[in-house]
Amino acid sequence: VLGLPRIVSTKEDFEWIVEQYDSISNGINFCTGSLSVRSSDKLVDIIKSVGHRIHFLHLRNNVLLPDGCFHEYGHIHGVVDMYEVVKALLIEQKRRIKEGRKDSRMPVRPDHGIKMLDDYNRDSNPGYPLIGRLKGLSELAGLEMGIERTL
């Protein structure tokens, strides 16, 4: 943001955070949008490494431009391989259930939707159109259901 580096932006940053305090309460908000703007970040590798500490999901997508800039895009379209991300998260969820953890659910925030249809007639903050967010949520839910049936 404004040319300033992010405080947490790599797998090693997340690993350092979870190692500082060995408690399930020391958790992560996993944002695919923020992490996907660095082409070197491998989101599935981050999930495999620190997934046991992910408590909240912010699933969104970006398109990277040749000059290093990016813009937000649809939830399942863009540089994030949302299929592989959701699959890794579902595997983590099944692992938690098997262990008997009470925090197996990871709530998802489906904002940053694409403005569409009647959204153009509604007042909303950028990235928060009603129908666009519902479309994104339904795409993610369908993806989740399809992957669950293969696990």
Predicted regions and their residues:
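Histidine-acidic metal/acid-base catalytic patches
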Residues: 1-151
